[in-house]
């Protein structure tokens, strides 16, 4: 059950119940200050996520989990630099610095994340020849992680997305959640973006067009 009763719900707040899930996207060392693909102020999402997670009975986490020499790494493409875009068989791909390589400390979820009730970790990006931003579907748009079926089997109706980075893995996760039929929210102050070449503004426009709602943690009825 959720961590509060109906009597505690303030006017205008969004109630969290057993049909709600919090998805915590990629709060991993590589994306935090000092990491190989650090998101500016990425560590600031951690206390916000820890606080709001206390109000959710259902929590799913994701973990970027790349092979060495992954197709999304600039180092895998001769003459290419990080943040350049190339065409791959499944579409356009931003090339990244090597990050979140399987089994490395950089791929570990931050030790400061404290969510003991988290029930599932979805690892993504572990197929060498296709990237995966979304917790639901790989970047080819066809290969499912199984998360949508898992959530539906647990009678989840609403998805709340947090984590790193707003304009890539968070946005893609939110749009795929909406596509799968879930009422979907991005909690803005529990996310941070990379903002490469206008990617953050585009992500907000794309998610709004998809029907994803943009809220703050203060909009939730969590004590």
Feature-to-residue mapping (PLM):
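N-terminal export signals
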Residues: 1-11
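Short, flexible loop segments at boundaries between secondary-structure elements
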Residues: 186-200
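Acidic/histidine-rich helix-loop elements
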Residues: 32-41, 134
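Short, hydrophobic/glycine-enriched beta-strand segments
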Residues: 20-26, 31
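Short acidic-hydrophobic, aromatic-tinged amphipathic segments that line or gate anion-handling sites
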Residues: 213-222
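Histidine-anchored nucleotide/phosphate-binding helix
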Residues: 48-52, 170-179
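Short internal beta-strands
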Residues: 60-63, 183-190
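Active-site alpha/beta core segments
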Residues: 47-158
